Amino acid sequence: MSNKIFTHSLPMRYADFPTLVDALDYAALGSAGMSFYDRRCQLEEELEYQTLKARAEAGAKRLLSLNLKKGDRVALIAETSSGFVEAFFACQYAGLVAVPLAIPMGVGQRDSWSAKLQGLLASCQPAAIITGDEWLPLVNAATHNNPELHVLSHAWFKALPEADVALQRPVPNDIAYLQYTSGSTRFPRGVIITHREVMANLRAISHDGIKLRPGDRCVSWLPFYHDMGLVGFLLTPVATQLSVDYLRTQDFAMRPLQWLKLISKNRGTVSVAPPFGYELCQRRVNEKDLAELDLSCWRVAGIGAEPISAEQLHQFAECFRQVNFDDKTFMPCYGLAENALAVSFSDEASGVVVNEVDRDILEYQGKAVAPDAETRAVSTFVNCGKALPEHGIEIRNEAGIPVAERVVGHICISGPSLMSGYFGDQISQDEIAATGWLDTGDLGYLLDGYLYVTGRIKDLIIIRGRNIWPQDIEYIAEQEPEIHSGDAIAFVTAQEKIILQIQCRISDEERRGQLIHALAARIQSEFGVTAAIDLLPPHSIPRTSSGKPARAEAKKRYQKAYAASLHVQESLA
């Protein structure tokens, strides 16, 4: 199949529309669209925005033929396909609430996914669920006790009759979709996002954050069930009339270099990934791959979704400098589903800007003080930019009082993109309506108005009044040549015992013992604390739907195993 390489053919508008429906209506007047690629980087399907609009309007009438009413939820298994996109926009035209849900993304996850899906469906109470054929058996198994739920494959959905009704356009305060959080610290919650809220974020992203241009072309492997994939690379291109190229997330995981090859092949200019995406490419690349790449076209290389390692990005930049990658294109950012997506972006063409602070002062006093001659060790944090226009960032203490710059505290946000609350949680909805602010659950500090994120509140390791960041301990493990980035996870137990779990591929017992002793010694030397090193088989570390390490789940599993071992010991006593 040949690629028409859709071009921008309309006067560019930066998401200045009242609803997602209005955004697609305008994009459909031009010739831009979406292209879907397989794992070999071969074009599978093209979907022009004018075609998407026609299919979405027809799909809306099909959904209404099921006697669904305005505000009903429609769960969508969010695979990277035109079927998902068409169903999502069909919900918008029908006045229904789309609920993108994750697909299984790893070895042996299908059984646990079915149980998780049951929980998500119980949470959002959808009237219908639409899925690709691959996931239909799992969906049927998860929904067999709910005979009133309409379970549809994409083919069955397209075969429904169209209701003979006039579509009622949504208004800005209508709910557009529920975005389930990744669940890094608790069971995922459904974030309520209205058309007004998402359009405010899309405008801020496109006009003030990334600063999109008419000639830009987006490339993404990010999943549509994650806010970076859904808002950043499905809704943003539509709202700015830009074309976008997609790889399936699972294909990227198997062949990460296909991401860079697609950027090079189609002269992509804007692409964003979590840090592990860059690390995977740098680890897997070889000389043959490099010979196929020219990354001079890449204008914005965004980074977000997890703590950002400057060293990791430096290694990527050094590796791909020979194929014209410019490290100034790096654009660290901060965001979360509760703000639709983005809160802040670093300055354009500034690259990765870091702030080094005295680690001891940080851990004992909670202040990000510049190192001096007396400094024993430093911690490094990445500049994630200033708040987007009309949005606010405050750092507050435990009492909710704003603190001075360089003081670490709770990152709190406000602005027109802030969610209406969590679905089914009236208290959260009332609190946001009353205050207009949200405590994100993240910790960080401001310096000259720029945000530096230090970690999650619930992940913080507190030992004898000292605050230790788990990523600092994990970083020590990841410096070992046999341990990859993301293969280590650190947490503290209820007994105040620090645990460092490592996915280890080393089979030699002597080498495993050496690794344990070396890491324990380094952690003792660096932090003055004792850590228990636990070597695990590959694929053992739990992750959220967005690929982040789920420290709370790892801790839960460890405590469960610990309790079981105590029970056995007591039984044998």
Stretch-by-stretch model annotation:
Residues M1-L47, T51-L66, K70, A94, ...:
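N-lobe entry segment of adenylate-forming
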Residues S35-E86, G106-A115, L167-R169, G190-M199:
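Conserved AMP-binding/adenylate-forming core of the ANL superfamily
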Residues A32, P161-Y180, R186-F187, E197, ...:
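Conserved pre-ATP/AMP-binding loop-to-beta segment of ANL
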Residues M199-R217, D227-T269, R284-D289:
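Conserved AMP-binding/adenylation subdomain of ANL enzymes
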Residues S264, S271, G415, S420-G421, ...:
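AMP-binding/adenylate-forming catalytic core of the ANL superfamily
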Residues D487-F491, L500, A520-A573:
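Conserved C-terminal "lid"/linker of ANL adenylate-forming enzymes
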Residues L20, T380-E394, E398-R406, H410-P470:
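Conserved ATP-binding/catalytic segment of the ANL
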Residues G268-V272, R284-A377, G392, A399-I401:
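Gly/Ser/Thr-rich phosphate-binding loop
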